[in-house]
Amino acid sequence: MKTDFNQKIEQLKEFIEECRRVWLVLKKPTKDEYLAVAKVTALGISLLGIIGYIIHVPATYIKGILKPPTTPRV
């Protein structure tokens, strides 16, 4: 039981040391880097939206052909 606790403590220490190393390497992005990432992200989201719309329109049209609209009950 004592060794399990010591092992967990060692794992925690190693994790904290790895986090510290990563933190020391990190740097704040420049304005140009930030804008480049924002542009690529916006382009990707737009592309996914366009692809979704291209799939949605024919699917809706085909759905309308295969299943005629029902008449409302009075």
UniProtKB/Swiss-Prot annotation:
The chain crosses the membrane at residues 37-62. Belongs to the SecE/SEC61-gamma family. It comes from Methanocaldococcus jannaschii (strain ATCC 43067 / DSM 2661 / JAL-1 / JCM 10045 / NBRC 100440). Residues 63-74 are extracellular. Essential subunit of the protein translocation channel SecYEG. Clamps together the 2 halves of SecY. May contact the channel plug during translocation. It is found in: Cell membrane. Component of the Sec protein translocase complex. Heterotrimer consisting of alpha (SecY), beta (SecG) and gamma (SecE) subunits. The heterotrimers can form oligomers, although 1 heterotrimer is thought to be able to translocate proteins. Interacts with the ribosome. May interact with SecDF, and other proteins may be involved. The keyword Transmembrane helix applies. Pfam families: SecE. Residues 1-36 are cytoplasmic. Keywords: Cell membrane, Membrane, Protein transport, Translocation, Transmembrane, Transmembrane helix, Transport. This is Protein translocase subunit SecE. GO terms for molecular function: protein transmembrane transporter activity. SUPFAM superfamilies: Preprotein translocase SecE subunit. NCBIfam families: PRK09400.1-2, secE_euk_arch.
